[in-house]
Amino acid sequence: MSDIIVKTTELCADFKIKDRMVRAVNRVSLSLERGKTLVILGESGSGKSTYMKALLRILPKTAAVEGQAEFLGNDLFRMSEKEFRDIRGNRMAMIYQDSLSALDPMYKVGYQIVETIRAHSSLTKAEARERVEELFVKVGIPSPRERMNAYPHEMSGGMRQRAVIAMALCCNPCLLLADEPTTALDVTIQKQILNLFLELQESDRMSIMMVTHDIGVAAQVADQIAIMYGGIILECGATRQVLET
């Protein structure tokens, strides 16, 4: 059995701008093994977040995606929407950079995470709430019961980001996609979250694909680094090899 958890081959993403198509991701071929971390490193606008959203099939309708993407040997682009919903948020989860848009402003934060858990498991409401409390403690949210009853706008940016991370981890995904996951956090919490990712990798063999512009973050967590610029992968290899060249 292959140890590759996700693989893309010649993946392209084009957007219709007025009367022409603009290529944001250009023939990207990458793979990630189980229990490893691949960091896509690049400046803003390089296409790294677009690539990740293409994997999750959440690009706008104006986008055209070509190429192949496999998750645990299954073709992501040929799955029905129902089949893909069973994977998204469950076996494959994403931490979004914009925590405010990732949470529904009309519902309490705890309720949203509880419902995510119950949609993908047989846990009771009480069991799901207990799971959320545990996750809030793990990601450094104080007074977890109180915070569960807060609406997104009642939390600081850093606190919301931690809640979004808890939501992504709530169903024990085997693949975590992370879009600048620690940008809104102070240095202490950032280190705590990155250490949590490493612990989950060790205990659950969770794979992480992360995009960032922060070389320090990449050096701390990555097994492999891919350098992206203008929608193209310029270099990909072991962390030390890439950073020392």
Regions found by a protein language model. Give the residues of each.
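Conserved ABC transporter NBD signature motif
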Residues: 64-75
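Conserved ABC ATPase "signature" region
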Residues: 75, 127-146
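A short, proline-enriched helix->beta-strand linker immediately N-terminal to the Walker B motif
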Residues: 170-174
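A short, surface-exposed alpha-helical micro-motif characterized by mixed small hydrophobic
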Residues: 218-220
